[in-house]
Structure formats: C-alpha cells, structure tokens
Design a protein with these regions (language model features):
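Beta-strand-enriched, solvent-exposed domains that form extended recognition/catalytic surfaces
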Residues: 1-84
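Structural preference for beta-strand elements that scaffold enzyme active sites
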Residues: 90-94, 114-116, 159-163, 216-220, ...
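A structural motif corresponding to the C-terminal end of an alpha-helix
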Residues: 147-162, 208-215, 252-264, 293-300, ...
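Noncatalytic carbohydrate-binding groove/subsite architecture in carbohydrate-active enzymes
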Residues: 241-375
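Aromatic-rich peripheral "rim/lid" segments of glycoside hydrolase catalytic domains that contact
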Residues: 133, 211, 215, 225, ...
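Short, acidic/polar
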Residues: 96-109, 198-208, 281-293, 379-391
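Substrate-binding cleft and catalytic face of glycoside hydrolase catalytic domains
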Residues: 110-276, 311-312, 408-413
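Boundary/entry segment of secreted carbohydrate-active catalytic domains
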Residues: 68-120
C-alpha cells in the first residue's frame, strides 16, 4: 500500500502487540524487498545479541506512531552447527525421571526406549559469575550441569532417548516479575539481561548434549502449563498473553537446540484436562491457539507432552470411574480410558508440522495408583497398566509413554503410582509391584501371558474391545 513502511525487528523481551514504537527497524520499499544484515549485534541493551531469536514484522509509519501491518515472523531456517543422525525410538515403552543404578538396571532389563529427566535450570546456571561466556556475559554453572552429564551418559550406554523437562523454581534468578507463587515459574523474558540468562543455560545444555553421545533428543518446556498458577506461574493472565510468553520460551529453546540437532522437538506440557479448564486454561484451546501461532509466525517442530492420569489420581479403576473421559474430540478429559482422543487430534492434518508431518506426542507423566499395597489394590494398578499399554501400542499417533513414577515416592501426597514400592510395614523398599511385571512384559513375547490375568479385573474378554472410535 501507499505510505512509509519499515521492517521491524522484535526481540524476545518485547511484546509486539503492545508496542507503538519499534526501536529496531530497517527502511523498505516496493511490493517485495530484500534486507541483508549481520546476524550478531555486538551491543544491544547490554548483551551481545543473536538475531536468530528475533521475529520480524512490517509496520506502517503513522505520524509519531508505527502501526503493525503484518504478523511477526520468525526465521524459517537456522544454519546448523552440527548435524547428528536422529536417535530413533526403539519402542514406545519408557520411564519417568530417575537416576539410580537400579533405575538404569530396570531400563536395560525392561528394554525401555525412552526416559525423562528433570532439569532445574536455576541449578544448572546459577547467575553471573565466571566459567561460561554467552551473549557478552559471564556465568557460573551449578551442580545440575554434572547431573545432566551423568544421566545422559548412563542413557547413552543403552541407547535411551532422553527428554529434558526444563523447570525454573519460583524463588530463583528466573522468576518472572508477575509471578505469584506456584511450584515453578515461567522464565523471565522481560529484559535483555533476563533473556540472555535463559538462553545461556539452554545454549550450554544444547551445545553439550545435542550432538553424538550424552544426547538430549527432546525438550519438554516447563510443566503442565494449563495449571499455570501451580506449575508454571506467571501471575493471573488472559490465556493468549500467557501462551504468547510460553511460545516465546519454546521458540528460544527450539532455535538453540536445532542448531545442534535438526531432529530435536520442543514439547508443550499439559495435564489430563482437555476441553475443561480445571486449572487456568483448557489444553485443547491452548493447542489450537499454538497451531494458529505457527501458521502466523512460521511453523516449528513443537509437539505435545501429555499427562493422561485418571480423572481422580487416587482411584486406579479409570475404566469405570472416568465418566467425563469420553470418545469425543470435545471430551472434558483425556485419560488412560480414552487415549484415542488425543491420538486422533495429533493425527489431524491441520495440526501437522507444515501440514505434512505428524508432531511428536509423548505421554510423558502418568501412572495408575495403588491406594495401598493390598493384593486387590496392586491388581487394579497392574490392570490399568495393561490397559494403557494395549492402547498405546495400537495408536499410531502416540510415539512413546514414560511411566511415572519408576518407584513410589512418599513426597507425592499419598500416591503410589510407581512400579516399585516404598518401605511400609512388612513391605521392603523398591520391591517390584505387579505393574512392574506388566511393564516388563509390555511389547515382548510374554505380554499376553502376563496381561491376560487382568481381563477379569477390567471386566473384558478381549483386548480389542477397549479400543473405540472417536466421534
């Protein structure tokens, strides 16, 4: 159109929809244009800035204002620094986070293909100091750096695909200025200095663990963002403002990790809610909005890390109790009962990466509970594990399931969702539960001989009858 137009560069610490003046611009003219600039800015707001993190928009000059005239767009391609071959999943079976010798022994004995790993970022990089340089700043590395080295090394010995869960504790250097508590915070991305700290931690981790050996293959960004106030707190926000920040966090990680591994995905973390917002937001709406963001700002390989716990985490009989987990794309919940729903959603072409490639879908945290260590409660838990595996093994949209927890944990509010016990009464610590044997048999020649004893508990005569068509 007629008038004076500029190409505006928007940094991660700027909110494009709230700006009236864009400080970083280039003049443009004509219906099409080419602008060439250096990738690195030696000094911008106190840091050495890499434009790989910027998005770009056309703005129209209107008097003393600059009016947004297009969607902002990220770079479609980032030049790789390394190109390792993909580390394939050998099967769908996995474990949630663990780090002991017995844990890795179980990984090998059960032939699991994948694990998760919690990374508390404020203990990976502890703030400005010495030892690591990024963006013109010096930082100190913390003890979690050695922990990540250890877990990824152990995982590489048996070919495990590792997904790192990126967490920022609330009272830490990463605390968002609008945070109001919760277990974890949305990382602070409101200033150049705060952004640089976050990017520094991810850059160090990716440059160390995205190439051959000691590999992180996927990045689960924060935890259960639909329950934002509890698990990734940014204060009380409209969904789209919260999601905009979350997508920025995902993009920062993505644009770093993909320089070292072109097979990496970043995964959004969600609870068992679907169209209902038991927390702050409904996951289905958040995912649909993320698809829309990708269409407007340029698609990237994001995926889903879903947590299909039973509706009531304490009750193992989800096949009876989960009445609001239906076989509809508008189901209120997605639990072990109706995994077909999220499988159907991820396989819809309108949700594919660039309309061509299915996104990664991991069930990255879930388990059935044994309310006690009685024989009947343990049988209910094991039956639920068998049901879950039978569904996952048949649903092509689900790439892997990481059972949480590997072992029962007394810090989990009375839940006993692990494959092994904690010490209680006559029960020894880390005793394999019946569900341990179910998980070991899953995907092997012994599967049916171990699983079939639980048909009576589930009230079925045939495993095929648990699979349903989504409306």
């Amino acid at each position: 159109g007629s008038g004076n137009y500029l190409l505006a560069e928007i940094t991660p610490w700027q909110d494009v929809t709230e700006m009236e003046i864009f400080p970083y611009t280039e003049s443009i003219s004509g219906k099409s244009f080419t602008v060439t600039m250096k990738r690195f800015v030696p000094a911008r707001e106190g840091i050495r800035y890499d434009r790989v993190f910027s998005k770009w928009a056309v703005v129209k000059v209107d008097g003393d204002k600059q009016v947004l005239d297009s969607h902002a767009r990220y770079a479609d391609e980032v030049a790789p620094k390394a190109s390792p071959a993909a580390l394939p999943l050998r099967n769908k079976k996995g474990f949630g986070a663990g780090d002991t010798d017995l844990y890795f022994s179980d990984c090998k004995e059960m032939n699991v293909g994948s694990i998760t790993m919690n990374v508390v970022l404020n203990n990976y990089i502890t703030g400005e100091g010495s030892g690591y340089s990024y963006g013109g700043k010096e930082y100190s590395l913390g003890p979690v750096k050695d922990y990540v080295d250890y877990v990824t090394q152990k995982a590489s010995e048996t070919g495990l695909v590792v997904s790192a869960i990126i967490l920022c504790q609330t009272n830490s250097i990463f605390k968002d200025p609008e945070n109001k508590g919760g277990n974890y915070t949305m990382p602070n991305l409101t200033t150049a200095k705060a952004f640089n700290l976050y990017a520094a931690a991810l850059e160090h981790m990716a440059s160390t663990h995205c190439t051959q050996g000691n590999r992180i293959s996927h990045w689960i960004m924060h935890n259960e963002v639909d329950f934002a106030n509890e698990w990734t707190n940014m204060g009380d926000q409209p969904m789209m403002r919260y999601l905009d920040r979350y997508i920025k966090s995902m993009r920062i990680c993505y644009n770093i990790a993909r320089q070292y591994d072109q097979n990496a995905s970043v995964l959004g973390s969600y609870t068992h809610c679907w169209t209902v917002a038991d927390g702050n937001y409904a996951p289905k709406k958040m995912l649909e909005a993320t698809v829309a963001y990708s269409e407007a700002e340029g698609d990237f390989r994001w995926g889903v890390a879903y947590h299909p716990y039973p509706q009531d985490l304490t009750k193992p009989s989800f096949w009876v109790n989960d009445t609001q987990a239906t076989y509809s794309l508008n189901s209120k919940y997605v639990t072990f009962k109706n995994l077909e729903v999220i499988d159907a959603w991820i396989r819809q072409k309108e949700n594919f990466y660039k309309g061509k490639t299915k996104r990664v879908l991991f069930l990255s945290e879930q388990g059935t509970n044994s309310p006690s260590y009685s024989e009947s409660d343990l049988a209910l838990q094991a039956a639920g594990g068998a049901w879950a595996w039978k569904k996952v093994s048949k649903l092509d949209g689900i790439d892997a399931i990481q059972w949480h927890n590997w072992a029962d944990n007394k810090a989990e509010g009375g839940l006993r969702i692990g494959l092994r016990t904690f010490a209680e009464g006559s029960v020894s610590n880390l005793t394999p539960k019946p569900v341990w044997y179910v998980w070991k048999a899953a995907g092997t020649a012994e599967e049916d001989s171990v699983f079939d004893q639980y048909k009576t508990t589930l009230g079925i005569s045939d495993w095929d009858c648990i699979l349903n068509t989504v409306e």
